[in-house]
Amino acid sequence: MTSSERVAKVVLVDIEGTTTSISFVHEVLFPYAKQNVEKFLRDSWKVDDIQRIVQDMQQLPQFEEYKVLLRAPPAEVDVELIAGFVRYLIDQDLKVTPMKTLQGLIWEQGYTNGELKGHVYEDVPAAFEAWRAAGLQIAVYSSGSVAAQKLIFGHSLVGNLQPHLSAYFDTHVGHKQDQKSYENIANLLKEDPKQILFLTDIPGEAAAARSAGLQAVILQRPGNAALADDQKASFELMPDFKSLQNLKLPINKYQA
């Protein structure tokens, strides 16, 4: 199928490696969270929402693993223990929901005070505008929390892109390489899966989406992981969003 022939009702975009550079996430966002997590927890330790996150983090199997690594783990859970655990999870690149939620709150402070601006590739705003003008919905599915997703697009280098976006999904709907997650998204969007185009940089995610009936395209942005030959042969590949700007809604057979 050529880009000019492709139709969809919804474009579902990944963030890291798709709309936003991997380097921004790993060289800006993650270090910012690591540097600021302890101060953030000290300032908000007694807040009910933060305590709920702390409780959820203690239920993670990695929490006991982390305490084993400590020479002298504290008798009680305190700021230093949880801050260290968060830094450990970030270093291990473990995408667990309570940690992602906490990261989102830390980043919110950074975006609000102007220390952070969300990176998007230069072709993203024009594609968003074209898709919305054509009547398509744009939704986001990322391992980062919904709050963090809104911050990247709401405080981007080119301004607020949130008006283009109609739905956000994170790991609460399931893991990104699980077919069921994409079925859940289609159900929540109330759309036929084949009318949803998923854009990602990860073959495993594209395969899961395709198994659920979605269309899937893999983005080969600068800095993205190289693909094996069999992966290149199995999926449609694109360098950016430019060739997708002509996406159209399917023609209603009663209007044709």
From Swiss-Prot:
Mg(2+) binds at D14, E16, D201. InterPro entries: Enolase-ppase_E1, ENOPH1_eukaryotes, HAD-like_sf, HAD-SF_hydro_IA, HAD_sf. Pfam families: Hydrolase. One of its GO terms (biological process) is L-methionine salvage from methylthioadenosine. GO terms for molecular function: acireductone synthase activity; magnesium ion binding. Gene3D superfamilies: 1.10.720.60, HAD superfamily/HAD-like. It catalyses: 5-methylsulfanyl-2,3-dioxopentyl phosphate + H2O = 1,2-dihydroxy-5-(methylsulfanyl)pent-1-en-3-one + phosphate. Keywords: Amino-acid biosynthesis, Cytoplasm, Hydrolase, Magnesium, Metal-binding, Methionine biosynthesis, Nucleus. Substrate binds at S142, S143, K176. Belongs to the HAD-like hydrolase superfamily. MasA/MtnC family. This is Enolase-phosphatase E1. It comes from Drosophila yakuba. The lineage of its organism: Eukaryota, Metazoa, Ecdysozoa, Arthropoda, Hexapoda.
